[in-house]
A protein has these predicted regions:
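Short, compositionally biased P/S/T/A/G/V-rich stretches that sit at domain boundaries
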Residues: 20-26, 115-137, 219-247, 252
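Structural motif
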Residues: 29-54, 151-152, 315-318
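Glycine-centered loop-to-beta-strand initiation motif
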Residues: 42, 69-77, 178-180
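Short amphipathic beta-strand segments in non-cytosolic proteins
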Residues: 43, 56-68
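Short, acidic Ser/Thr/Gly-rich low-complexity loop/linker segments typical of extracellular
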Residues: 63-74, 173
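Short Pro-Gly-centered beta-turn/loop motif in secreted/extracellular proteins
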Residues: 76-84, 92-93
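Structured interaction patches on ligand/partner-binding surfaces of diverse proteins
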Residues: 92-115
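Extracellular acidic, Ser/Thr/Pro-rich low-complexity tracts
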Residues: 144-155, 210, 251-258, 314
């Protein structure tokens, strides 16, 4: 009994001698310096995919602070005050995204957000065409080609147009070439001439199913070929009947100073319908004639009616084609 009383006395004595424990630890909820803070960790990905988006800017609107996602799309905000926080995500060629997070004291919120990417034009080209003819007048048109992709997948693409000034012309997708294409004739343009396009900035406009729009960097027409080569022989004005074993194409060259090559084309005519039976591309501009029977793998030409043409093609791919020259194989 005496031992128990002694221990109790000592305990009471020590308790009375010890001051209150200081509470200045900022991690101690009872401390005056304690701050109710949490964190937000997240990842920005391409919508409908698992690929992270690097270089996206995530901004905390409450505290006016921003971070940039790493190569895998991850980001972190530390020491955020407890409560609701608003964020906005921006990235070039992606639709902005906003979201809210309720930050809890002492905890880390995990967030994953998917961004919708606008379409991307990876290739764009416009080539001019002139088709000379006896009647009614030369035909002029342009071929527009564009390659367009979408970060969210090709199925996300909705529409693609060729744009000039306030005008838009729809482009059609080709399964064969995997490109979008349109042929625009001079009568489709305000001045009834493709010269209307010369010097004007041209664009490809694309839109996805979520209505995100991309307008390409401007591109321009390089040249309209007005001076084409002229067939000399065979010709209905010289000798329209040719032996099957002596077909020699002759023409006069164009009066131009730029680099170019020739394309020759031969078609058979049956009841007014033309069928291309032979062509030669990339013939050097130094040539002014070509012996058909020296061409490897040439087709056998049966007796009948034919027409041939010679086109001038510049280094960009623009071309001007001659009038058709008719003849007969006997």
């Amino acid at each position: 009994m005496k031992i128990t009383t002694t221990i109790l006395f000592i305990g009471l004595f020590l308790t009375g001698c010890v001051d209150d424990v200081p509470r200045d630890n900022p991690l101690d909820p009872e401390s005056a310096g304690y701050k109710k803070e949490g964190s937000v960790n997240g990842r920005i990905i391409i919508a409908n995919q698992s690929s992270g988006i690097s270089g996206a800017v995530v901004r905390n609107s409450n505290e006016s602070v921003s971070v940039t996602t790493d190569s895998s799309g991850h980001f972190s905000f530390l020491k955020l005050s407890e409560g609701k926080h608003s964020f906005i995500v921006t990235k070039q060629n992606f639709t902005n995204d906003t979201f809210n997070v309720s930050v809890q004291s002492g905890s880390a919120s995990q967030i994953v957000r998917g961004l919708n990417g606008a379409p991307i034009v990876t290739f764009q080209q416009i080539l001019t065409r002139k088709i000379d003819q006896y009647f009614p007048s030369p035909q002029y048109f342009v071929d527009v080609t564009a390659s367009v992709s979408d970060p969210n997948g090709i199925a996300d693409l909705d529409s693609v147009w060729f744009g000039v000034d306030s005008l838009k012309y729809p482009l059609t997708y080709s399964v064969t070439t995997k490109n979008f294409h349109a042929t625009i004739y001079k009568y489709d343009l305000p001045t009834n001439t493709i010269q209307y396009l010369v010097g004007r900035p041209l664009t490809v406009i694309s839109r996805d199913v979520n209505k995100a729009v991309n307008i390409s960097a401007p591109f321009f027409i390089t040249r309209v070929i007005e001076n084409e080569a002229s067939p000399i022989s065979p010709s209905p004005f010289v000798d329209d009947t040719v032996s099957a074993d002596s077909l020699m194409f002759k023409w006069s060259p164009p009066n131009v100073t730029y680099n170019y090559s020739y394309t020759l084309s031969l078609s058979r005519v049956d009841a007014g319908t033309q069928t291309v039976v032979w062509s030669l591309i990339g013939l050097n501009s130094s040539n002014e004639s070509y012996d058909f029977y020296t061409h490897p793998g040439r087709p056998m030409l049966l007796p009948g009616s034919y027409v041939w043409t010679v086109s001038v093609v510049d280094d960009f791919g623009n071309y001007g084609r001659s009038k058709e020259s008719a003849f007969v194989i006997k």
